[in-house]
């Protein structure tokens, strides 16, 4: 019988993260510094509503306070910026996120730039991305951080390995490439995008393929070197359900892989909690267990 790839369980890994955070949250609460997460949601997109609700459930699970600011899709840019300003000043809020995407009439970059970098729970403020480039301490983007924790937790070699990252977006691909090339990781990274000629030529020589393109079943089995590790990050909602960037047939070729559901997604949410706790620790003058120099 053909051997199937080992499934990397993101739900289990996320639960381990949550378990470890409860102790840190309790320690902060003991000194009157209970962490708090704020969310700003503009519009009624079903996917965004679900994501935000899940983040608040996660907070309750580990003892983090959470605060919601929800607005209609017609909310003005001024109203959104006002909400950002309020959370910047709210002492109960250790960190917050603006749920993306925003309606077309709102300048996403203007809104994200208005977030206090010391309350940037998503790690997407230009200051924090700049800190990542310079290998300085700062908040890391949630999905790339979760990916590295998944790889380490499943004994996937990083240093010296050949990575192929499919997709160069600001939330996953580009920051992931930066994190993989830090001195603490020292991986060799190839970034491919929609303009790349013969993407498969790059993936077939990679030890680890990370697909973050948002194109259903993009990565085919013949793209993968036997025994490689393959992570599916992007998702596409269809009438048949949620599809990942990786064709399920890859399971017959890869050594380890994540499915569309229960893989990278749970770790992204867990890393948001971890970022909030670290922001609260930093504000309280407690040395965090991790920094961008050494952390996943």
From Swiss-Prot:
<dbReference type="GO" id="GO:0000105">
    <property type="term" value="P:L-histidine biosynthetic process"/>
</dbReference>
<dbReference type="GO" id="GO:0004477">
    <property type="term" value="F:methenyltetrahydrofolate cyclohydrolase activity"/>
</dbReference>
<dbReference type="InterPro" id="IPR000672">
    <property type="entry name" value="THF_DH/CycHdrlase"/>
</dbReference>
<dbReference type="GO" id="GO:0005829">
    <property type="term" value="C:cytosol"/>
</dbReference>
<keyword id="KW-0658">Purine biosynthesis</keyword>
<keyword id="KW-0368">Histidine biosynthesis</keyword>
<feature type="binding site">
    <location>
        <position position="235"/>
    </location>
    <ligand>
        <name>NADP(+)</name>
    </ligand>
</feature>
<comment type="pathway">
    <text>One-carbon metabolism; tetrahydrofolate interconversion.</text>
</comment>
<dbReference type="Pfam" id="PF00763">
    <property type="entry name" value="THF_DHG_CYH"/>
</dbReference>
<dbReference type="InterPro" id="IPR046346">
    <property type="entry name" value="Aminoacid_DH-like_N_sf"/>
</dbReference>
<keyword id="KW-0378">Hydrolase</keyword>
<comment type="similarity">
    <text>Belongs to the tetrahydrofolate dehydrogenase/cyclohydrolase family.</text>
</comment>
<feature type="binding site">
    <location>
        <begin position="167"/>
        <end position="169"/>
    </location>
    <ligand>
        <name>NADP(+)</name>
    </ligand>
</feature>
<keyword id="KW-0511">Multifunctional enzyme</keyword>
<dbReference type="Pfam" id="PF02882">
    <property type="entry name" value="THF_DHG_CYH_C"/>
</dbReference>
<protein>
    <recommendedName>
        <fullName>Bifunctional protein FolD 1</fullName>
        <ecNumber>1.5.1.5</ecNumber>
        <ecNumber>3.5.4.9</ecNumber>
    </recommendedName>
</protein>
<dbReference type="GO" id="GO:0035999">
    <property type="term" value="P:tetrahydrofolate interconversion"/>
</dbReference>
<dbReference type="InterPro" id="IPR020631">
    <property type="entry name" value="THF_DH/CycHdrlase_NAD-bd_dom"/>
</dbReference>
<keyword id="KW-0554">One-carbon metabolism</keyword>
<dbReference type="InterPro" id="IPR036291">
    <property type="entry name" value="NAD(P)-bd_dom_sf"/>
</dbReference>
<comment type="function">
    <text>Catalyzes the oxidation of 5,10-methylenetetrahydrofolate to 5,10-methenyltetrahydrofolate and then the hydrolysis of 5,10-methenyltetrahydrofolate to 10-formyltetrahydrofolate.</text>
</comment>
<dbReference type="InterPro" id="IPR020630">
    <property type="entry name" value="THF_DH/CycHdrlase_cat_dom"/>
</dbReference>
<keyword id="KW-0028">Amino-acid biosynthesis</keyword>
<keyword id="KW-0560">Oxidoreductase</keyword>
<dbReference type="GO" id="GO:0006164">
    <property type="term" value="P:purine nucleotide biosynthetic process"/>
</dbReference>
<keyword id="KW-0521">NADP</keyword>
<comment type="subunit">
    <text>Homodimer.</text>
</comment>
<dbReference type="GO" id="GO:0004488">
    <property type="term" value="F:methylenetetrahydrofolate dehydrogenase (NADP+) activity"/>
</dbReference>
<keyword id="KW-0486">Methionine biosynthesis</keyword>
<dbReference type="GO" id="GO:0009086">
    <property type="term" value="P:methionine biosynthetic process"/>
</dbReference>
